[in-house]
């Protein structure tokens, strides 16, 4: 970029044509006086008065735009966060020292005068200018994404507002100075803390200029940039539209400042004049951008994509069986080299209701797959429903493993069970005083070890028969409602937990590979066809024996 001090009078006139509309009436006066770039950077209120710019407001607009050119010309290679903080600290110290030295003077009239001296107001203006230069850095990437710098920025803004409000109040100068000293001391503390606590190299890195070419712009396509202009004429890019020319260039990032458009400096211009300059050449645009350092704040200045919601594409066919793993998704995102703002991927819902699957992708309740060995731990999600798959595998292993159920070998080869016809006594436990009927009781091993309450195996078995893990129940055809009896079949029935929590019913014994069942205190041996023992069917119940003993005692 050519220094502003080397500008010709024509370049100065071209620059003034992009300023505010109210200043266009003075363009011919700049052209008539043939003011070059070096004279422009040194222009003052008196020079503008001689040019014919008599209105104070118009003079301030010109001088603010010239200040931006001075910062671009003289401060590009020297301005960084550390220097800006030091400048703000120096300005606050100067103001504090001025007030202290003035109060030591014998001619001090702060307690009686309501008019602040010009030197005091000038020091306040310099302090606010230094704060504005620092805020211009803190208000952009990468500092906007850091909490500490955001808090510092908000504090400085509030202190500057308090400072400007204080000097405009109608009060004694001494009271005004007291409030200003309070603000200055807080600013000094913020600057000292920022310098001491921040050790990142980005504090000492300066900005740089980069030229970006956007060729082959299609008619009606646009550049795809979002630009925010400050009140004094800085143009900052806040984002780019996805797949736009600006996005495809991979060189335009959020926080970049537009300095030139097609070799024309646009610093201090109105936004509408900048847009007009961007549309001047429909075939392509050459931009000169001022880029801030990124440092090691874990911030990558990638394009800020359009934040408007993009509706997903309508699926006309079922989704494919294979889903993309997070590892492959991560690799793809790295290849695209788009960071800073990540695209959220929301997986589509499955085409069919969810059923747990094993690692091979087959259903776990199909009746043909067995899990005889513990499954390995999850190696990563393989589908949007991977958490449910892993949870299902974990629960199967915890409950169905024979090592976890000592004395009760349980297989996971579960066959669908048929639902019996509901009777008036359905779900009610058998009274303990009733005799054990061999027609409906299962086989009990008299030498089996009794199970104590609270055992881990029993808890696991009860969980196994809860309504969350039993196989689908198939409705059986109607049968005569026998009380406590079933048609004689070759299958043995055992007592288990019903699918209704808290009740008991009799389910197929094929669910177990062992004849041992819980609740052994309620079971007896079944009558065998080849054995002559009939004690299990003829033995009186406990209640009958109690009545017999009672009669003996009464006699």
Swiss-Prot record:
Annotated family: Belongs to the CNKSR family.
Domain notes: The PDZ domain is required for interaction with ENaC and SGK1, but not for interaction with NEDDL4 and RAF1.
Domain DUF1170: 325-546
GO biological process, one term: negative regulation of peptidyl-serine phosphorylation
Protein name: Connector enhancer of kinase suppressor of ras 3
Lineage, opening ranks: Eukaryota, Metazoa, Chordata, Craniata, Vertebrata
Function description: Involved in transepithelial sodium transport. Regulates aldosterone-induced and epithelial sodium channel (ENaC)-mediated sodium transport through regulation of ENaC cell surface expression. Acts as a scaffold protein coordinating the assembly of an ENaC-regulatory complex (ERC).
Chain spans, region Disordered: 309-334, 347-390, 517-537
PROSITE patterns noted in UniProt: CRIC, PDZ, SAM_DOMAIN
Record keyword Ligase present: no
Organism: Homo sapiens
Record carries keyword Nuclease: no
Modified residues (Phosphoserine): 381, 383
